[in-house]
Amino acid sequence: KIAEIMEDENMQNSMNHPMIQDQIINGLDVDELPDGVGDFGHAAENPIPVNGALGELLYLSLLKTKDTNLRLLFHRLGSVESLDMYETVSIDGRKWDILFLSMYHPRKSKKTPNGYDLADYRSQPLLYGTNQRVKNFPYGLQSAIQETTEKMIGIPLPPPQVREAEESVRFHRPPEHEDRIKIATQHVQGLIS
């Protein structure tokens, strides 16, 4: 059943509240928003179109770094209207990033932000992050994923790779990344002012 949920976007869409489901189904069916401005996925004005909260998690779980082929760990920093801002880090702790997603679309984009590729979901059909904010990200991510998967699909499924990374990798947010988070947060908040 989990593989079916990972693959079937209609099933994913049907798992949403009816009001949200309607917005998703009636959203633009595109890989990139036609009025997007800036670097795809990296600019708040050019977010990645996905199908709902589960679509965000599935899309981000399939992203891998182009240069090292590593999956990303992620959590949601916040949201404004239909725009969600996620912090990501490669599972080896070397590549930190911020990505923007727009969740009211009938399917997930097949396009990737610069520096990333999409993995085949069949290779590891697991979620590598959460739509919650994790205070000491990525430490504590495993339990947040467990809560998220139990809530969304009824089964707590934290990937063992997340636990292994939490135990063996020394994650340290670079100061310039911390600055980017502050700037991006202020920018996103300014979009609705």
Range-by-range predicted roles:
Residues I2-L83, S90-S193:
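N-terminal secretory-pathway/extracellular module detecting exported/lumenal segments
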